[in-house]
């Protein structure tokens, strides 16, 4: 198989996967409310959902490394189907919470599986393309998948395409489509990401019998490696900043629109533009990397410091137009180094613990996000959203300096870091 064929297969699979995820994004909170949940109960459900993912992230990453990444991914699809089916029948808080646990577990099972699979397959194929450029193409497809899924997910409840007497709300059609699409993706993935390909091309590695041992080994490496340590530390802060901005931009914009006769379509438009901006950032990251002579650490450092400066500006906006421009510019700069950070992480990790390391990275984002939801939410309530964003900007700028600690020779494009 050629590099181009592998990229095409994986990008298509990821676009399909994330389009299914996008189906629930526009209506998730509305769906919970139709189950009789108030905002406090919804907060409990979301904390349980995220907490389940965080708790299972690392051990299930070790499971994928030991028992097969493609098989583990398929298990995540089955768990998604089960969780969505239970949510379809849930009529009280307890059943919704159980469904949230299943869906959180599905996210944890998925974390790092196919990403690690693709990296190993890509490195085993000779070709001129770099992993960074391949990742940029894939992330563009992921973004378009999310955008398409979100658009369809927002349209489905009003479409009236399907309605059964046992359905509890108009939003249940989204769950039906998620279940159907996940079953279809199970079948399609057998062709796009075959287990046989992994068996033929992957190098056999000694595998410890104890999953906890695998997790401890990966954790130890992540906090002692000259590249992985700053990457993980900054990833924690990245999760905090991302959560702070995503949780607070809607109420901030609502205040700006309070004197205007604007509907919710403004929020939808800005969200759609955000997806397009993220795709543009991923595409341009390859060219921008060449400006830094292939140094991933410098690309990340400069783009994150610049995004921190823009976040300060976002806290000062007072008009819709200025808010939209600065908000989109922030996310363009904030995501510009995402591919480079993934390269540093992947290249620094031994193949036999790659899924585990990706799960640890995802865990850092989750933990940072959970902490930010509580801490920055409190600050926003008592001191204002602008203050929260300014503090987040300071944290982002300070943590970005950690990339300067990475040895220059280990942050070059195409350099093996293991």
Q: Which stretches of residues belong to each language-model region?
A:
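Transmembrane alpha-helix termini and helix-breaking/packing motifs in multi-pass membrane transporters
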Residues: 30, 34, 146-174, 251-259, ...
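Helix-loop junctions on the cytosolic side of multi-pass membrane transporters
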Residues: 169-171, 178-206, 405-417
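C-terminal transmembrane bundle of multi-pass solute transporters/carriers
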Residues: 43-47, 54-58, 62-65, 70-71, ...
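Cytoplasmic helix-loop-helix junction between adjacent transmembrane helices
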Residues: 101-142
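Hydrophobic core of transmembrane alpha-helices in multi-pass small-molecule transporters
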Residues: 15, 83, 94-110, 321-336
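C-terminal ends and interior cores of transmembrane alpha-helices
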Residues: 78-92, 96, 305-318
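Helix-loop boundary and gating motifs at the non-cytosolic
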Residues: 2-55, 88, 227-274
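Juxtamembrane intracellular "pre-TM" segments in multi-pass secondary transporters
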Residues: 1-5, 193-233
